[in-house]
């Protein structure tokens, strides 16, 4: 990874942890059993050293990224933030059991991604509203403009077209992520108005010192690249990266289908892109099947695949290391973009040992 990004990594890791630590210890994220649908296993953060219990506000989040934003904003306040999605699962396609709805009912606030992204969250919200439950609803997407599903692609290209709907993965653009941090801060202020100054300060610090730095480092990566096309063996989740940094992010399918719904024609189109641009490395989604990526390695000039993620979930080891949006950006997505764009050799990208760990990962 280039020196700018390496320096940014060190600064950001320190700053984020400083925000979370505050004047006293913040409880570390607690890992649960991968595949469990009991809720809360993606992590729990209790700010200002409070014990978990009913004497302080409890906030639950439907998606990892917004759990992470909420726990950072809530640092040094009595607010407890919980992630509902179990460790190891994708926050989009997961279907919880009835206990999750009860956790939302019991919580003081529910942070969600907006309508039509997580059907289970939409159903839970409908239940809350129908039953008159007073759980505060915090829409992380409020006021954020969405881009088209093929926004970074050529609509004249065969199979692309227009009017395919909107891409819901807005948080991959750090500037749009800043608006979601503000939305979450507004909701937490309404929940705990006595702590407004701390909540606003935490949000402002995170936006300025973390999200703006991530944005700048992404921009350095993409502006340094000689090629402006990235082939992903993954579903269509990265159009905001393409729009923000003027690069074609080519998924295997343009709609929101998961990568295990790939047709032979999708693989054929990917092969043509790989041949046309001389692509040697592709990105593969951490929480999706690796079969399409493995097929491209077998049948094309692609040498290997490396990880990308739309921050849709966390692995067990990420929870143990207390990784959030920032750490995933610097340790997963940025090194892979450096490699797939041809900026860096795999062995030179990321932290020490990154290529050995993630090359053709299982």
Language model feature labels by segment:
Residues 2-15, 20-21, 26, 33-362:
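Extracytoplasmic metal-acquisition and chelation regions
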């Amino acid at each position: 990874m280039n020196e700018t990004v390496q320096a940014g990594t060190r600064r950001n890791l320190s700053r984020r942890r400083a925000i979370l630590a505050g004047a006293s210890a913040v409880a570390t994220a607690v890992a649960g059993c991968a595949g469990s649908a009991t809720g809360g296993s993606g992590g729990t953060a209790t700010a200002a050293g409070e014990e978990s219990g009913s004497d302080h506000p409890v906030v639950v989040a439907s998606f990892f990224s917004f759990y992470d934003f909420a726990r950072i904003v809530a640092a040094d306040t009595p607010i407890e933030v919980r992630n509902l999605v179990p460790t190891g699962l994708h926050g989009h396609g997961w279907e919880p059991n009835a206990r999750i709805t009860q956790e939302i009912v019991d919580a003081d606030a529910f942070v969600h991604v907006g309508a039509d992204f997580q059907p289970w969250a939409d159903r839970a919200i409908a239940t809350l509203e129908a039953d008159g439950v007073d759980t505060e609803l915090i829409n992380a997407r409020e006021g954020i403009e969405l881009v088209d599903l093929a926004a970074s692609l050529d609509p004249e290209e065969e199979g692309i077209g227009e009017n395919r709907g909107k891409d819901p993965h807005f948080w991959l653009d750090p500037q749009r992520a800043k608006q979601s941090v503000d939305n979450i801060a507004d909701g937490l202020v309404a929940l705990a108005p006595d702590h407004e100054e701390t909540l606003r300060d935490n949000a402002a610090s995170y936006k300025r010192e973390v999200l703006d730095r991530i944005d700048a480092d992404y921009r350095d990566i993409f502006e340094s690249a000689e090629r402006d096309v990235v082939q992903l063996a993954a579903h269509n989740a990265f159009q905001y990266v393409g729009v923000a940094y003027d690069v074609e992010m080519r998924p295997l399918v343009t709609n929101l289908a998961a990568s295990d719904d790939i047709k032979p024609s999708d693989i054929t189109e990917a092969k043509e892109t790989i041949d046309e641009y001389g692509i040697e490395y592709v990105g593969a989604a951490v929480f999706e099947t690796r079969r399409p990526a493995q097929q491209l390695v077998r049948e094309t000039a692609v040498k290997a695949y490396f990880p990308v993620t739309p921050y849709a979930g966390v692995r067990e080891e990420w929870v143990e290391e207390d990784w959030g949006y920032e750490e995933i950006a610097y340790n997963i997505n940025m090194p892979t973009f450096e490699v797939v764009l041809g900026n860096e050799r795999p062995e030179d990208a990321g932290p020490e040992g990154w290529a050995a760990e993630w090359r053709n990962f299982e």
